[in-house]
């Protein structure tokens, strides 16, 4: 059986210019279809739970694609392409945003951004 191996990169951006705002990302890795990966985005300089936070991605040679959002009240929404496979969440005590990605596909290969 043939497997596709793809790199998933993780970086972060903060919308607008604000002093002392930092997003530190971990979790990118080498995966294969059907695998799982969790991306983390640790924030400082603002409170994750008081803002809406999004994940977006950019596949090679393509434009930005919105993936998911979590609002301050906890409501979550997903792009149709990831619904049922990806889960956005946050840990308020760690001020960290997460994206749990399951049942990964070759087309999920992209640069992933967390954004405020």
From Swiss-Prot:
Residues 20-116 form the Ig-like domain. GO terms for molecular function: antigen binding. One of its GO terms (biological process) is immunoglobulin mediated immune response. V region of the variable domain of immunoglobulin heavy chains that participates in the antigen recognition. Immunoglobulins, also known as antibodies, are membrane-bound or secreted glycoproteins produced by B lymphocytes. In the recognition phase of humoral immunity, the membrane-bound immunoglobulins serve as receptors which, upon binding of a specific antigen, trigger the clonal expansion and differentiation of B lymphocytes into immunoglobulins-secreting plasma cells. Residues 20-44 are annotated as: Framework-1. This is Immunoglobulin heavy variable 3-53. Residues 45-52 are annotated as: Complementarity-determining-1. It comes from Homo sapiens. The keyword Iron-sulfur does not apply. Residues 115-116 are annotated as: Complementarity-determining-3.
